[in-house]
Amino acid sequence: MNRYTICIQLCQQCLVDCQNCLANMAGKQSMNECPVCCMECIDACLACIKSMSANSKFSKAYAAICAEICDWCAEQCGAHSHEHCQICTASCKACADECRKIAA
């Protein structure tokens, strides 16, 4: 297990949970940026996974931006009571916490 393994796993789970949230919110009105943040978070997690998998010298930078985007997504989805939004929120928070450890 390398130093990125846990972060990669949490990014993967966050990506899946954001995709699920996005699919469930498709076509529905949102009082905030929930669907938009899920799209951003999916892209950020994927980029972070790719950089860490390649042991890129930019992994810390990717992890920092991923944490910021995950925090935003957790805030947006956390405002909704839907189960998929709450799952997404928890996943985003866990991913952000681990990404911050990598970025430090």
Positions of predicted regions on the chain:
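Amphipathic alpha-helical hairpins
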Residues: 1-104
